[in-house]
Regions:
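Flexible loop linkers connecting adjacent transmembrane helices
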Residues: 13-18, 52-55, 80-104, 129, ...
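Transmembrane alpha-helical segments of multi-pass small-molecule transport proteins
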Residues: 106-110, 134-156, 172-181, 350-364, ...
Length: 474
């Protein structure tokens, strides 16, 4: 029996490969390579992730900068494996798991939908709060318009339009590099924090390490990247499964470079957020940062209006990019798990269930901003769900990546297997650490009920914070 996925002889050629081969300018070639990998990497730096990076810098200065270097190969390996599964099988990750490992798929997809919806709601609130930093209008006013804009982009925009918009939104994250320069960090201390790993047996420090790991290697990115590789194939005319199955050496090579570029971009942004907040908030003793908007507000009196403005702009771009990825990956997971037609390049009338999931997840996320739910509690729950399913999902991903009936000769090599399995082990251990630190954190918060209730009752906007009000409280 042949282990190689069958390839349709009528498979349309990939025009991108021919264009890349013909392009001599390395910069233009890189621009043409960038696609799902860049978008995936940029969407990883969503407002919730930015808040985690800001917390790391504010609480521990430069002591966690080294973590970004450690996470880069892990993140790159995992996302490239997911991209390869999509390219070679011609299906999204959930579609492959449905055929080969269905038992764990459905609870994983359920947890994914819940976690993504909570995360999307928090990100919508963060976008509105960031706009409020720029415009003197209550943040709650922007919740509905932002949500409807995101829905319209996904439902009515073509795949190419969405991809183009996402690429430009990714550039907004470069604002964090500029914000770090305004912070004027101590270069020697930065180099030490980057190159010398710091290990502390401090529950808070261990907790932030686990949080950094969990916000970087997230299950929704596994589903998104595999599905986007399939979308790319469909967009060049490979609409039938047999036309998409199999992938040439050059297609995999360019997918690898795209993934590397996206993950490097993601970790550079994370690095500079930690650097900027470490050089300002940590030095000034402002360690009580619970969100990205907190960080932007706190930066203003320390690093000036320009740094705070750049942080707010980056936050808006990150949120508008991340919310569609969160709701879209949930829709891909559900649709592929149940065998429904899916795809952002497919008209809503031909894939109604797919778009219903997108719209429902966005609207529920929007509604959470009006219910007075504590956003930090919701994000903790989202992080726990992601942490719990990441390890088991990675085990399944690694099994598929070594299954010749799925990938043929494109199964993982030794290097990918080593990095992939090490990452899987680390994520499983991280999940245990996340559960422990969450239980400890919740038990401590239960011991101080008045503070939690008071802060929640003061924010009638739900998940949306009004910075001016918060600063007067302080």
């Amino acid at each position: 029996m042949s282990a190689e996925p069958r390839v349709d002889p009528a498979r349309p050629p990939d025009p991108k490969t021919a264009q890349l081969r013909a392009e001599k300018n390395p910069i233009k070639r890189l621009g043409k390579v960038l696609g799902p990998g860049l978008i995936t990497g940029a969407s990883d730096d969503d407002p919730s992730g930015i808040g985690t990076y800001a917390q790391a810098g504010a609480q521990f200065g430069f002591a966690t900068l080294w973590v970004t270097l450690v996470m880069l190969p892990m993140m790159t390996a995992v996302q490239y494996i997911c991209a390869k599964i999509g390219l070679v099988s011609g299906k999204g990750l959930a579609g492959v798991l449905r055929e080969h490992h269905p038992r764990l798929l459905y609870p994983a997809v359920l947890a994914l939908v819940v976690a993504n919806t909570l995360n999307a709601g928090a990100d919508i609130g963060a976008i509105a709060a960031a706009i409020n930093l720029l415009v003197p209008v209550p943040a709650i006013v922007f919740i509905v318009p932002v949500s409807l804009f995101i829905i319209a982009l996904q439902v009515f925009g073509s795949y190419h339009l969405i991809e183009t918009v996402f690429k430009w939104l990714a550039l907004a994250l470069l604002a964090y590099l500029a914000a770090a320069l305004f912070a004027r960090p101590d270069v020697i201390k930065v180099m030490v924090g980057t190159l010398v790993p710091t290990i502390r047996l401090d529950p808070k420090y261990i907790g932030i390490l686990v949080a950094l790991l969990g916000t970087t290697i997230s299950p929704y990115l596994f589903f998104w990247q595999a599905s986007q590789e399939v979308e790319e194939q469909i967009s060049i005319g490979r609409r039938h499964l047999r036309q998409r199955q199999g992938a040439s050496h050059f297609e995999l090579k360019y997918a690898l470079w795209d993934t590397i570029a996206g993950m490097v971009f993601s970790e550079i942004v994370a690095y500079f957020i930690i650097l900027a907040t470490g050089a300002t908030l940590f030095v000034a003793g402002k360690t009580d940062i619970t969100s990205a908007t907190d960080a932007a507000e706190a930066l203003r009196p320390i690093a000036g209006d320009a740094a705070a403005l750049l942080l707010a702009i980056g936050l808006i771009g990150a949120g508008v990019l991340a919310v569609p990825v969160l709701t879209g990956s949930a829709a891909y997971g559900v649709s592929e798990a149940f065998g429904w037609k899916s795809g952002l390049d497919t008209k809503p009338g031909r894939a109604p269930q797919f778009y219903i999931v997108i719209v429902a997840a966005t609207l529920v996320g929007m509604a959470l901003n009006f219910l007075g739910i504590n956003p930090i509690t919701a994000l903790v729950l989202s992080a726990v769900l992601n942490g719990v399913i990441a390890g088991p999902l990675l085990i399944l991903v690694m099994l598929v990546a070594n299954d010749r009936s799925v990938l043929g000769e494109r199964v993982n090599g030794r290097v990918l297997n080593v990095i992939g399995w090490v990452t899987t082990a680390v994520m499983c251990l991280g999940a245990l650490g996340l559960i422990v630190t969450t239980l400890v954190g919740l038990s401590r918060s239960d011991a101080r009920p008045r503070e939690g209730v008071g802060r929640a009752s003061e924010r009638k906007e739900g998940w949306t914070r009004t910075p001016q009000r918060r600063s007067t409280e302080q």
